Amino acid sequence: MLEAPGPSDGCELSNPSASRVSCAGQMLEVQPGLYFGGAAAVAEPDHLREAGITAVLTVDSEEPSFKAGPGVEDLWRLFVPALDKPETDLLSHLDRCVAFIGQARAEGRAVLVHCHAGVSRSVAIITAFLMKTDQLPFEKAYEKLQILKPEAKMNEGFEWQLKLYQAMGYEVDTSSAIYKQYRLQKVTEKYPELQNLPQELFAVDPTTVSQGLKDEVLYKCRKCRRSLFRSSSILDHREGSGPIAFAHKRMTPSSMLTTGRQAQCTSYFIEPVQWMESALLGVMDGQLLCPKCSAKLGSFNWYGEQCSCGRWITPAFQIHKNRVDEMKILPVLGSQTGKI
């Protein structure tokens, strides 16, 4: 294990085969050229120069102000504003952070990833990088850092987000049902304080686009035939098993993952579509009506609703299957589409 030098000591390793520690004793080397630590690691330019650091990724509430010194002007820097709280959205930044580290290492730069204390936010980012580059499950990557630094302990929210990252194949796929459900849950945590709902939360109204993806299914109001949503908006879930299926508000990665629609589910749970926006603002729950004929299609509840299979979905935008018809969209003559 590494020993941080005392006030009058030089750089020493208690084990010559162990990873190096900087002379400042404020950063640990995870692998050649990759360090993590706290705010003290960037307090003095000399600390960075001694360790050969030429790229710094900061994950903190404030961006550090680097003192002038040799090499500071040439530093690669990336700042990700983030509090060390379970509700902080770190997942949406992971691809950018992992790419920054990867590019810096590819160009021969040594990288420091730091937060304030060097135990949670920076640990989460380094864990994501190890997961991606070494194709490691969350637990194995996290364990590597805890061996290096036993006090390393990311909050439970970051743990959950990294498990979602793993479930998405080590990349943030914004089109996946997992990410869409995650994004909805993050909005729910702030609702109803939000004055406006983020526009990226809503799927495009299918009446505003003429074509869909290959093999997509279009769902129409059974009464008036108005197009309502596409199959890509359906958020699949695993079958529930009684009260335990909705004992926890937050869905786990395993409950978000499924290989197909559940036949026993009598409703589709979908992401919000643009035509729903006026009905959702300022209220916690209500009915979902067809925007054309006002036929009742289903309901929504930001606190969640139980599916007929037993799974609790939060938040819930539920369309009853017996209120809509499926229309398969198939490509015809290249750019045209046909419906069957």
Swiss-Prot record:
Substrate binds at residues 116-121. It is found in: Nucleus; Cytoplasm, Cytosol. The keyword Metal-binding applies. The modification N-acetylmethionine is found at residue 1. It holds the Pfam family DSPc. Keywords: Acetylation, Cytoplasm, Hydrolase, Metal-binding, Nucleus, Phosphoprotein, Protein phosphatase, Zinc. GO terms for biological process: dephosphorylation; protein modification process. PANTHER family: DUAL SPECIFICITY PROTEIN PHOSPHATASE 12, DUAL SPECIFICITY PROTEIN PHOSPHATASE 12 FAMILY MEMBER. This is Dual specificity protein phosphatase 12. It comes from Homo sapiens (Human).
